Amino acid sequence: MVMLVMATVGFAVNFWAWALISPLGPLFRENGKLGALSESDVALMVAVPVVVGSLGRIPVGALTDKYGGRVMFPMVSLATVVPVLALGLFAQSSYLLILVFGFFLGLAGTAFAVGVPFVNAWFPPERRGLAVGVFGAGMGGTAVSALTTVRLYNGLGSAVPFLITAGILVVYAVAAWVMLRDAPGRSAPAGSFVSRLAANARLPITWQACVLYAVAFGGYVAFSVYLPAYLRTAYDLTPADAANRMAGFVLVAVVLRPIGGWLSDRFGPVPVLAAGYLVVVVGAAVAASTPLLEWLGTVAFLAMAAALGSGSGATFALVAKVTEPARVGGVTGLVGAAGGLGGFVPPLIMGYVYGRTESYAIGLGLLSVTAALTLVLTLTTVRSTLRAAANDLTQSRRTTHHHEERM
């Protein structure tokens, strides 16, 4: 339990750092500190850390398989301190500098690929869905950023939110080095990074989970980084009000993620995923009409938050059930990268479409269609993969039992 708590805290702290720029995007546009910024400029600013953190999960996941979470958690946390301090102390004077150090801030997003294999190894298969879901609730670090960054920026100074986050990252890195232990019996995989990456990429579950997570977690990331700008533009909210509502969205998704993992342990991942994508199909279609925020709009967005959170938890419950333990880190890196990239593209599309149509309807309509296609994939191909894995496990147990009887 201590290992799960420490991993979850590390994930949350790094995600807090990863999301520092997002709440400030609309504020920079409003106060003119960086000059005249377009909707696309803000979208790019908040999306750069997302794509770097996503692609970085591929090598970091493979390195975690090799060196373990006890080494990688402190390493990622300490490395993240550098861009956080740079953004707080001098980079806010230039849009270009924010993009450059936002690029390196993306390193914080790779903590996810450290935690999943680390936590997975500490729990038996029948409890991994819940355990990885609890760890995944660390994505609530983005809510901490949403609730505190603008307040600290306006109240205490532009550097303060970054200095506080950097200090917490250092404290966590030291605590992780002292307290974390890799699961007993952990063995480093054989072969080069390239050969292991290729082998993991060829697994059917890898590309299937990549699609599932690109929509579920990608949708969550897209909303968590772009929702403040969307609410500011579509509903004319203040930056603080928009950030608070985004925090509510994040909180619902965070709470539902471990519940999605637990439900997957009880009923299987496919029903949980299918229900989640169906909710997104309907919710995005409703939101596309820009309904009144105080009732229908709020219900639509919170329902999607619940669906995306539970779907994210269910995806890694699926990975844990189908993937052999020695490959979980590598597969997690690829799937996590897909999820992050799924969060990178929608803000750019939304900003581009709004800049030309002054409407978000097309972007949200595309989300609804994408979720519908993913629902079909879940009920067909993914269901078959899970059934085949269950049959293989049953056959393996029968073979082992027969061998033991002969001995």
Segments (PLM) and residue ranges:
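Central cavity-lining transmembrane alpha-helices of secondary-active solute carriers
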Residues: L44-G61, A247-I259
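Cytoplasmic helix-loop-helix junction between adjacent transmembrane helices
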Residues: F101-G138
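Juxtamembrane intracellular "pre-TM" segments in multi-pass secondary transporters
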Residues: A183-C210
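C-terminal ends and interior cores of transmembrane alpha-helices
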Residues: L78-Q92, L278-L292
